[in-house]
């Protein structure tokens, strides 16, 4: 039962298993796990996890239930009371396993089987889940890639659409352009037809003109015939006139006889007059008060003025009415005029130069013409013949003028017009009451003279002519009548004067005055007008009173009060001056008859300083017949200063003109200049202090002519800038301020024309008419603009003057300002908004006017000056910002602002058809023409009425400018493409260089263009590869096509004109000029053939290595396959190797092979195994069993100097040489597997070593490779830097090579010499590892005008690269192993003091010899930059004073520590001297010792601050030690470099620098060093050089070389013979103990001491 009951359970338990297996089999058949999705896999996983959990729960439940069922089944049937049942149970339990049968199935085994099955299923499911997850991740990655591809596809699609849109627009534009071009073709055809029609018309006109010309020729022949006929008539008339002349000569002879008779009669009359007694002359002389004035504008060299003196009769009435007079100083070198004199215009036609005619269009607005000065007379200038008397002041009487008559001016023919701009010649005169009549003259003639002259001015009883002032109610008609009468009298008087001329040589009869001057006006000199010197009257005898003649009017003069001047007595006492006890006065002269000239030798010469002349008076505004009063000559501030040259006249800016009339009241005696101060209240003239009270009666006083009313006086005041008088007149009522004279000039016009801004402001404030025009239509603004008075222009514009007013000829203020070149006025008018296009009647514009005078500034303003914003017309900032740059802009057209004037105005033609360009070209104004050509609308082909273009009328310079007008200046550039990669030392290599600019003209053909490009390239290649500084012009004469670097026109790969490819010799339909303009080509780029084409031309141009050498390097690589390039660091090895690899790769690819470049950078950690993996992975090393491929491999090993060549390449040397399967080599891989390999024949191996030469074990590798050495002193490195820097300079100057004297060339040459000198010095020192290639100097900055930039760059290069390398090289050379465990690395980290001193000395010498020497900077600037260089202040005397100590064999050259104990007395030490080696027998040059300078203490502090590390390393307790021969050799080599003549001599620098010392070769200078122990040493610190020490350092040898155990490296430098000799000599050893040191001086020792810093003690390093 138990068995049965137990046997049914397994069936139940197997049933679900069978069911599950069936279900699983069915599931496998239904679906595949690999095809499930992610969600289905997740669902399956969750179901299976739930099933596992359910199974676990079922197992647990079954375990709990099965225990109870088992007990029940096993023991439930049995009853304990039945013993047989227990026996049966025991029997079954005790039976054997084979015999007994299980009662029931074991449930634990079932459970274990189920659990094992479940675990297997779980493992399977986990594996399937991991696989599913990996597939899911891969799927997600693919989805992301798909999305990225879709996005990229979208972008490409969008870009494609954009390109389609752009292309569509381009196509539309092209279609549109085609339509426009077709329309233009039609228009051009129409224009051509019109032009042909015009041509036919012109031909017809030409035929007509030819006919007219023939007609004119016939007329001319007829005219010639008439001329011949008239000439014959003239000959006949000439013969008749000759006959008449003979008759006149006979008549003249008769007249001469009559003259002789008259002379005899005159002598008889004189004898009769001498017999008669005369009045008492001495008393008359004392009472005579005659003062004459000389007024002038010139210096001492003047012309005399003829005067005649009035006679003063002696009577009681005269004494009563005599005005107050005073003695005054005589003038210096100027004629003297009577106080009663009146000035008049010289009426001689030869004396005055007529001014510019008023009827001219605008000529009267331009400045005054230059007066013509007649030559000075010899000794005495006389009037109407020689003088008849010998007295110094001959006098005569002349008839007076009418009281209201004006002197003859413009109305009389032959007289200078009063409105003339030229200063008229004039004389000073005074009327006289008593006339002198010639006794021999006909009485009828004398009566006629007095008929016309006697009634003019009646003399008073004193003999002075007084003239009453004109009353205010004098009508113009009366004035005109008076003027007409005066003119008539003057005319008749001139006619009569021909017959009343005195006879030459006639003696004067006593009692009868000398002959009067009644002739015509003589050609006297220009009057010298002076107001600061007045002479007193001469005390000589007065002339007698002539007898009264019948017919003379003796009526008294009209009543007129005499104006008297009150003079202070103290002031008057100092005003007179006598010269040689005689005061010279010139006699008064008559007005119309003539001028008497006195002898200039009799004029006094005063020692008083000449004061500035009184400003002249311009009376051009006064009408004809108007006289000028003395008041009108006054100006504000017009008095001369007391000291010459301290003050200027008030109107010094106006043109210098002479007053036409100078009037003085007959009763006023002028005072001297000393009393005429501006502050004097009694001054006769108006001064800046105000209106003088004494001037009021002066205005009413009499004069030579009436003042013609207040308006005329107003014009005179305005013309002369007399603000005080003008303001007083403006304050009067009823005055017409707009009154105009005959020519239409108002007071405002006169003030504006003469530039009197204050007067203009006064008149404008008084509401004067601002636009009042004269008879020619010119306004005050026109006058001010023409004269350049910009302040008046600004003021008139502010008062709303018409800025566009045109005169009768069409001239506007802008036109007049441009015509006269007044830039400021042009600017003001343009800012006010004037019209620039107004034309004159002859078709001229302001542009024509500016160009006609060649005024560049005005033309620029017209073209480029913009009108500022409204209301800011006079804002300086606004106007300045809008003004075109008048100084620059010619060389930079792109920086010029756009012109503001239209093309129509630029091309406007005048009446003759000339444009502004025609005028500028014809006159040779190249600057103006160039400015006009900048306007794009200029039409240089426009023709004038004579069918001439601008080029036809242009000068040679302007023709050249016009020919190059439309020339395109396109820069020509050379491109080498991209230099890659940048880490190959190509950072400083330029990709593009501008070599020149090509001028492409309209007539340039494609052949000419090709030749120009080829020639420019050839010239550039030759210029940069030459030895000197060549310009492009210098190399044009060289016919060679190839340069020194091998580049030529054949090196060109392609040429691009803008963006269009072009090749030399190719031609397009369009000309080059049209092609460049249409394609907007801004540059021409020449691309050189490079490695991509299998050529090396671009590499040659980029690196400046000659093409032949690069090709040779490439041939070596192709031939030998194993090439190593080595040279000093910075020799461009990496760049050369990479470019060769690129070229080789593309050559192989062109031949049909696939090629690959493999680059490996070697460092100290790079092992042989890594190199093996590199060779194997790159298929260079091929297993013997494997067949070789056709692929070419180029392997580049860089920086091989960082590892040991023998260790790295030892195993590869044999297979590299024998590349075949016959000589395989076994290599062991990293996994320990060994295999045989051989090198592929198509493998190229190139390496680079930054080392000048190989040493030691590396030499074993040398024979297995082809070596290319890049020496610094040989090509290609020797000339590379020179060529590279020259190309950089040419590129900086845009293709033009500067002259060798240019500072840029000098600084570049200096940088080149620094590199060469530095390597030369380092080679002499035996430190090849410190040599530098040219790479570090390729970055030399080229900044024109800033050489300091290059010096600063050099200091950074020195401190960052050169100095550390030199320091390391010197240290490695001088360091030795002093102990077995003391390695070289430790020595480098902790150098000894001797090594530090040697390093600093080497740096200082290298800096001064190689770097600072030859610097083109001035010494002062170089001193400022010296502090930036490291190691430049080391004292060089230390090096020059050292010499290796003599020592025995086995002794070292160690320095002994000096005793600094204060207890040691100085008496035990003898002062050592410099022991010079006796080298006379050795033939060695004696090493020199520097003379210590005592005045260098000031520079020491500076050196200490610059070199702090020296004082830090050499302290008080240390001393210098030289422990090896190498250090001694270095010092000796440094010494020889200091005194070398083959190298740059630093002594040339030393004598002008503080941180260097001169090296004296005499060798006789004692040592100025003393012990510091003796404090009582008489040598002071100031007397000792800073470079010497106060302590004594002795050289002693204490230990032998064997004791030190020093392993010394032999020096590579040559050892001089003296050293061997010195080493063989014996020196005594000085014994020392721990407490005391006994120093024994050997006088025979050949040794020298080091003189170090005075505060530094030297100590031997502790052993």
From Swiss-Prot:
Lineage: Eukaryota, Metazoa, Chordata, Craniata, Vertebrata
ANK repeats: 709-739, 743-772, 776-805, 809-838, 842-871, 912-942
Organism: Pongo abelii (Sumatran orangutan)
General function of this protein: Regulates the dendritic spine distribution of CTTN/cortactin in hippocampal neurons, and thus controls dendritic spinogenesis and dendritic spine maintenance. Associates with the striatin-interacting phosphatase and kinase (STRIPAK) core complex to regulate dendritic spine distribution of the STRIPAK complex in hippocampal neurons.
Any one GO CC term of the record: actin cytoskeleton
Name the record gives this protein: Cortactin-binding protein 2
Coiled-coil ranges (or none): 119-276
Stretch forming the signal peptide: none
UniProt xrefs under PANTHER family: CTTNBP2 N-TERMINAL-LIKE PROTEIN, FILAMIN/GPBP-INTERACTING PROTEIN
Quaternary state and interactors: Interacts with CTTN/cortactin SH3 domain. Interacts with STRN, STRN4/zinedin and MOB4/phocein; this interactions mediate the association with the STRIPAK core complex and may regulate dendritic spine distribution of the STRIPAK complex in hippocampal neurons. Activation of glutamate receptors weakens the interaction with STRN and STRN4.
């Amino acid at each position: 039962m138990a068995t049965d009951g137990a046997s049914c359970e397994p069936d139940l338990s197997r049933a679900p298993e069978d069911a599950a297996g069936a279900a699983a089999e069915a599931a496998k058949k239904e679906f595949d796990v690999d095809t499930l999705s992610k969600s289905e896999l997740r669902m399956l996983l969750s179901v299976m996890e739930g099933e596992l959990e359910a199974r676990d729960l079922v197992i647990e439940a079954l375990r709990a239930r099965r225990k109870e069922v088992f007990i029940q089944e096993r023991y439930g049937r049995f009853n304990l009371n039945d013993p047989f049942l227990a026996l049966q149970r025991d029997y079954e339990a005790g039976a054997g396993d084979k015999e007994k049968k299980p009662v029931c199935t074991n449930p634990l085994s079932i459970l274990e089987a189920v659990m094992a099955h479940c675990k297997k299923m779980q493992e399977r499911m986990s594996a399937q889940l991991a696989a599913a997850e990996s597939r899911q991740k891969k799927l997600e990655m693919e989805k992301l890639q798909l999305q990225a591809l879709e996005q990229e596809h979208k972008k490409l699609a969008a870009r494609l659409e954009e390109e389609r849109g752009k292309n569509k627009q381009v196509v539309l534009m092209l279609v549109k352009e085609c339509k426009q071009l077709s329309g233009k073709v039609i228009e051009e055809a129409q224009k051509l037809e019109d032009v042909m029609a015009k041509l036919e018309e012109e031909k017809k006109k030409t035929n007509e003109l030819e006919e007219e010309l023939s007609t004119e020729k016939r007329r001319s022949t007829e005219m010639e015939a008439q001329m011949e006929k008239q000439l014959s008539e003239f000959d006949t008339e000439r013969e008749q006139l000759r006959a008449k002349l003979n008759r006149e000569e006979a008549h003249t002879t008769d007249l001469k006889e009559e003259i002789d008779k008259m002379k005899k009669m005159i002598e008889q009359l004189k004898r009769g007059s001498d017999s008669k007694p005369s009045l008492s002359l001495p008393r008359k002389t004392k009472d005579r008060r005659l003062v004459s004035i000389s007024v002038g504008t010139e210096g001492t060299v003047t012309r005399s003025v003829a005067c005649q003196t009035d006679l003063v009769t002696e009577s009681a009435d005269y004494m009563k009415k005599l005005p107050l007079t005073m003695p005054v100083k005589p003038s210096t070198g100027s004629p003297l005029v009577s106080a009663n004199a009146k000035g008049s215009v010289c009426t001689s036609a030869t004396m005055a130069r007529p001014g510019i005619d008023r009827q001219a269009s605008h000529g009267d607005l331009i400045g005054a013409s230059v007066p013509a000065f007649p030559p000075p007379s010899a000794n005495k200038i006389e009037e109407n013949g020689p003088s008849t008397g010998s007295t110094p002041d001959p006098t005569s009487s002349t008839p007076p003028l009418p009281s209201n008559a004006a002197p003859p001016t413009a109305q009389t023919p032959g007289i200078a017009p009063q409105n003339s701009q030229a200063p008229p010649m004039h004389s000073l005169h005074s009327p006289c009451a008593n006339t002198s009549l010639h006794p021999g003259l006909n009485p009828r003639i004398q009566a006629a003279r007095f008929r016309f002259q006697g009634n003019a001015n009646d003399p008073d009883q004193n003999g002075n002519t007084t003239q009453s002032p004109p009353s205010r109610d004098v009508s113009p008609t009366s004035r005109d009548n008076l003027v007409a009468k005066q003119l008539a009298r003057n005319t008749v008087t001139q006619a009569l004067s021909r017959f009343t001329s005195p006879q030459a040589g006639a003696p004067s009869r006593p009692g009868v005055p000398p002959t009067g001057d009644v002739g015509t006006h003589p050609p006297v000199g220009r009057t010298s007008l002076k107001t600061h010197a007045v002479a007193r009257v001469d005390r000589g005898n007065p002339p007698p009173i002539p007898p009264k003649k019948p017919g003379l009017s003796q009526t008294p003069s009209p009543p007129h009060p005499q104006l008297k001047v009150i003079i202070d007595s103290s002031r008057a006492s100092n005003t007179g001056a006598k010269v040689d006890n005689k005061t010279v006065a010139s006699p008064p002269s008559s007005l119309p008859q003539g001028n008497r000239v006195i002898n200039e030798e009799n004029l006094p010469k005063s020692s008083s300083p000449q004061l500035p002349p009184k400003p002249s008076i311009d009376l051009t505004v006064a009408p004809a017949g108007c006289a000028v009063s003395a008041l009108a000559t006054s100006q504000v501030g017009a008095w001369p200063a007391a000291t010459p040259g301290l003050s200027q006249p008030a109107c010094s800016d106006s043109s210098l003109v002479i007053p036409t009339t100078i009037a003085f009241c007959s009763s006023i005696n002028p005072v001297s200049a000393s009393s005429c101060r501006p502050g004097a209240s009694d001054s006769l003239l108006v001064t800046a202090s105000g209106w003088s009270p004494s001037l009021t009666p002066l205005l009413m006083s009499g004069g030579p002519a009436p003042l013609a009313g207040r308006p005329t006086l107003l014009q005179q005041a305005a013309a002369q800038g007399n603000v005080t008088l003008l303001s007083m007149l403006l304050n009067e009522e009823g005055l017409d301020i707009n009154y105009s004279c005959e020519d239409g000039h108002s007071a405002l016009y006169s003030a504006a024309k003469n530039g009197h801004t204050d007067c203009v402001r006064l008149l404008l404030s008084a509401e004067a008419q601002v636009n009042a025009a004269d008879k020619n239509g010119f306004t005050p603004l026109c006058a001010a603009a023409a004269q350049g008075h910009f302040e008046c222009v600004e003021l008139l514009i502010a008062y709303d003057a018409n800025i566009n007013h045109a005169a009768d000829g069409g001239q506007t203020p802008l036109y007049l300002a441009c015509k006269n070149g007044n830039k400021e006025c042009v600017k003001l008018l343009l800012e006010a908004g004037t019209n620039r296009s107004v034309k004159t009647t002859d078709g001229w514009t302001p542009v024509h006017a500016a160009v006609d005078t060649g005024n560049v500034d005005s033309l620029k303003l017209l073209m480029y000056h913009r009108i500022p914003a409204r209301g800011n017309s006079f804002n300086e900032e606004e106007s300045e910002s809008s003004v075109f740059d008048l100084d620059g802009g010619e060389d930079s057209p792109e920086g010029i602002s756009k012109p503001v004037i239209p093309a129509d105005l630029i091309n406007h033609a005048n009446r003759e058809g000339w444009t502004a360009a025609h005028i500028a070209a014809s006159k040779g104004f190249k600057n103006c023409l160039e400015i006009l050509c900048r306007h794009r609308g200029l039409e240089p082909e426009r023709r004038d009425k004579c069918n001439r273009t601008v080029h036809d009328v242009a000068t040679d310079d302007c023709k050249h400018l016009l020919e190059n007008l439309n020339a395109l200046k396109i820069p020509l550039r050379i491109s080498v493409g991209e230099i890659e990669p940048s880490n190959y030392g190509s950072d400083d290599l330029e990709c593009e260089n501008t070599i020149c600019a090509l001028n492409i003209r309209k007539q340039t053909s494609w052949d000419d263009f090709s030749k120009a490009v080829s020639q420019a390239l050839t010239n550039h290649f030759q210029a940069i590869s030459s030895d000197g500084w060549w310009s492009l012009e210098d190399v044009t004469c060289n016919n060679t096509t190839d340069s020194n670097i091998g580049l030529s026109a054949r090196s060109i790969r392609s040429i691009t004109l803008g963006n269009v490819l072009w090749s030399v010799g190719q031609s397009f339909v369009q000309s080059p000029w049209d092609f460049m303009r249409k394609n907007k080509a801004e540059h021409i780029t020449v691309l050189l053939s490079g490695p991509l084409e299998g050529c090396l031309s671009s590499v040659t141009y980029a690196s400046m290595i000659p093409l032949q050498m690069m090709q040779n390097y490439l041939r070596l690589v192709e031939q030998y396959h194993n090439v190593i390039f080595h040279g000093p660091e910075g020799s461009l090895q990496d760049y050369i190797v990479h470019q060769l690899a690129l070229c080789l790769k593309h050559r192989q690819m062109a031949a049909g092979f696939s090629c690959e470049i493999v680059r490996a950078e070697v460092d100290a950690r790079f092992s042989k195994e890594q190199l093996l993996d590199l060779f194997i992975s790159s298929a260079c090393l091929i297993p013997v069993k494997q067949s070789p491929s056709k692929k070419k491999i180029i392997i580049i090993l860089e920086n091989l100097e960082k590892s040991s060549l023998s260790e790295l390449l030892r195993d590869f040397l044999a297979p590299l040489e024998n590349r075949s399967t016959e000589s395989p080599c076994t290599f062991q891989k990293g996994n320990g597997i060994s295999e045989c390999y051989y090198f592929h024949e198509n493998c190229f191996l190139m390496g680079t070593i930054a080392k000048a030469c190989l040493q030691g074990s590396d030499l074993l590798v040398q024979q297995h490779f082809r070596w290319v050495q890049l020496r610094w002193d040989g090509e290609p490195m020797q000339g590379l830097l020179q060529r590279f820097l020259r190309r950089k300079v040419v590129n900086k100057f845009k293709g033009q090579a500067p002259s060798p004297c240019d500072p840029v060339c000098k600084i570049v040459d200096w940088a080149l010499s620094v590199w060469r000198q530095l390597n030369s010095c380092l080679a002499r020192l035996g430190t090849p590892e410190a040599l530098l290639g040219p790479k570090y100097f390729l970055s030399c900055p080229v900044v024109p005008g800033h050489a300091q930039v290059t010096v600063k760059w050099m200091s950074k290069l020195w401190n960052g690269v050169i100095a550390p390398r030199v320091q390391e090289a010197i240290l490695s050379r001088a360091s030795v192993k002093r102990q077995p465990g003391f390695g070289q690395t430790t020595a480098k980290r902790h150098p000894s003091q001797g090594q530090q001193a040697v390093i600093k000395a080497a740096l200082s010498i290298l800096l001064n010899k190689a770097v600072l020497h030859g610097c083109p900077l001035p010494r002062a600037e170089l001193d400022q930059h010296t502090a930036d260089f490291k190691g430049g202040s080391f004292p060089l005397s230390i090096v020059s004073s050292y010499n290796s100590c003599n020592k025995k064999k086995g002794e070292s050259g160690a320095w002994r520590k000096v005793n600094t104990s204060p207890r040691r007395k100085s008496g035990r030490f003898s002062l050592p001297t410099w022991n010079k080696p006796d080298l006379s027998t050795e033939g060695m040059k004696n090493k020199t010792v520097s003379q210590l300078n005592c005045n260098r203490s000031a520079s020491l502090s500076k050196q200490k601050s610059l070199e702090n590390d020296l004082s830090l390393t050499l302290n008080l307790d240390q001393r210098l030690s030289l422990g090896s021969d190498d250090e001694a050799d270095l010092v000796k080599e440094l010494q020889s470099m200091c005194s070398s003549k083959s190298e740059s001599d630093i002594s040339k620098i030393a004598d002008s620098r503080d941180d260097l010392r001169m090296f004296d070769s005499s060798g006789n200078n004692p040592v100025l060093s003393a012990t510091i122990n003796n404090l009582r040493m008489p040598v002071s610190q100031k007397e000792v050089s800073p470079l010497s020490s106060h302590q004594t350092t002795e050289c002693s040898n204490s230990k032998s070389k064997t004791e030190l155990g020093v392993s010394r490296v032999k020096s590579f430098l040559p050892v001089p013979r003296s050293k061997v000799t010195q080493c063989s000599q014996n020196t005594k050893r000085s014994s020392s103990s721990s407490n005391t040191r006994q120093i024994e001086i050997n006088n025979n020792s050949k040794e020298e001491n080091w003189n170090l810093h005075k505060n530094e003690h030297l100590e031997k390093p502790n052993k």
